[in-house]
Amino acid sequence: MAKQVGIIPLVGTIDGVNFYMRKGKAVARKAGGGFTGKAIKNSTNMERVRENNSEFGHCSRVKKLFKDSLFPFLGKQRNEELQGRLMQLFISIKNADLVSKRGQRQVGLGLQHADGKSLLTGFCFTSFNLPTENGFYDAATTTYTFTEFAPKSLKFVTGATHLELQLGVVVLDLEAMKATLFSSDAVRVLKNGAPQAISLTTAIPNDASGYKIAVLHYRYLQDVNGAFYGFQEQKGFGLMVVGV
């Protein structure tokens, strides 16, 4: 790319050279190097672009399916940073598919490998990352257990009186492109409560087919005359993948 020199900047193509404005400056470059829809679809030089587009589209659809299924926990999160992190997450999981050839790699096949599962496990949707050193997930019973949960160890947001805990399991069927969320009963613990063991169990129908992704939902609550109000800001609630 070269800069134009002259009193009047040119725009257009002359003798195989493209003249155009870029960031307020008149520049010129050899014509024919740009991308066109026809070239992307048919040119052998664009094969890698086609492969990337195919896999990117697949990951984007899976990301939307997964995120939409978590609406009861996430609500209407207009968060571009989260969207970007989720997209990068599913691209990385797709890369764990070592069976399919490039351009046909899939998130589902990536989740069949330990590397793919480890990428998803521990993913936190908000800046509120709940300590889980004393917690573990049992996939066989779809139960998450805290051997000792100590509310006093947490830094409660101003006005909060309780913390609510709930386990969700997303059944992600990538063949039917369907995702269903099943949830446990919620457990509320008092801000100054004593350490206690907590178990959260989610019932899932026997015929549910797909990858079972367990998420721990937690949020601060304020008790106002017996009515509980949740905090929706980023530091007021959280959602974390705890098992696949």
Go through each PLM region and give its residues.
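Charged linear interaction tracts used for macromolecular binding and regulation
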Residues: 91-240
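C-terminal tail/extension regions appended to the core domain(s) of diverse proteins
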Residues: 7-11, 44, 51-52, 58, ...
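Long, polar/Ser/Thr-enriched low-complexity segments
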Residues: 1-127
